[in-house]
Amino acid sequence: MASWPILSVTTFLPLVGALFIMLMKGEDEVVKRNARWVALWTTLITLAVSLVVLWRFDPSSAEFQFVEKKPWLAGTITYHMGVDGISLPFVILTTALMPICILASWRTIEMRVREYMIAFLVLETLMVGTFCALDLVLFYLFFEGGLIPMFLIIGVWGGPRRVYASFKFFLYTLLGSVLMLLAIVTMYNEAGTTDILALMRHSFPLGIQKWAWLAFFASFAVKLPMWPVHTWLPDAHVEAPTAGSVILAAILLKMGGYGFLRFSLPMFPVASVDFAPLVFALSVIAIIYTSLVALVQDDMKKLIAYSSVAHMGFVTMGIFAATVQGIAGGIFQMISHGIVSGALFLSVGVVYDRMHTREIAAYGGLVNRMPLYAAAFMVFTLANLGLPGTSGFIGEFLTLLGTFKVNNWVVTLATLGVILSAAYALWLYRKIIFGRLEKPSLAAIRDLGPREIAIMTPLVVLTILFGVYPKPVLDVSATSVTALIDNYHHALGAAGGTKAALLGF
């Protein structure tokens, strides 16, 4: 038990900052300036508190740490918070990217700045809460609550088709979550509790396992997203403001992968084995199909959005391989993708702020005017295609290695996606960066400024650091991943399940 509620502080501190901004009064320009600074300092302090959690975290233990548990609703539903080696990396990723998003919005958002900053701070609270919640109802409230601020961020501050994109995002994700709510009610009736730790120990009948697995899968597959329920993502990315795209790709998508790790494998192990061939098939289709679609895009954001779907295919493949390397690789891939995809969307935002277009054909030869930008964009592009020495390689390699132990045909097909990712990533870089600076509109384009350098530098450093030294991320999650696998196979053995079901795919 933590001596003080550090997870609650980490979770709700952004909400306190949002309240301060809400109560601001004065002239419009003064309120705008103060709202930006309060949001920035709030996210920086939240990051500092989360780093204290990381510093005090014991990676040698698979138990949940910094646990807070208080009675809440109906005697059985509790306010229960805690982190383990699986959830903590996502908490740190969230708190680390939020100050960057605030800085990225510093000059680009001029309309309703106060409301914009409030939306982002509320969203941070809901995202951190999702990764810390240890009660199913509490998790559901945080998980679903995140829809509202993101819906507003896209719908109010987005592009010309923002209303269509925001409603499509909202309806897709809400539909899947309705099924999850029905599964939660069923699980409560069966187990008599909504405590996640108790539900992990509960042995659900096979019929309930399969039905509940499908219900949770529907929600998490849309959130991740998996093929074929991915079509909301490109529209949402294209219309969202730059910082909205960063959070959408870097954090919100990861809630789906986290859900598979926290619920699908430990609570429904037999169903996870039975449905693993389905997940493998959808993952391979996502990797190959969306990579091919990315090759024909003429909008930079759409290309990166489709590449995100392909990369999440490696994540689901590794998770449901249910091997140590597969799951460790899936977690690392999500953390790496959070950094790299966020950086790519920020890179698009840099040139969009100058030229007000995302059309690939509108650019070319930027290296002649923007050498710093070209260097940073090169690092992120190489990481996106999984080049050794960058963080993108580690996750993909581990997921392929872990899945190969279960099904080598799946790995063979997925490897085609690695080749295709190199094709679309290098094509994008060549079209935008290389060549002569022939377009008159680009003649006066300026390189990265001090604020943009401050945003890009930590992302470049992390992309390279985790590529050559992945130990910090892998060590934090290693014990929890091993415990998850051990409990998973123990549950299969107790239920008479067998991993041989996977080999028949």
Predicted regions and their residues:
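N-terminal signal-anchor/start-transfer transmembrane helix
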Residues: 9-27, 218, 225
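Hydrophobic alpha-helical membrane-insertion segments
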Residues: 41-56, 173-182, 383, 419, ...
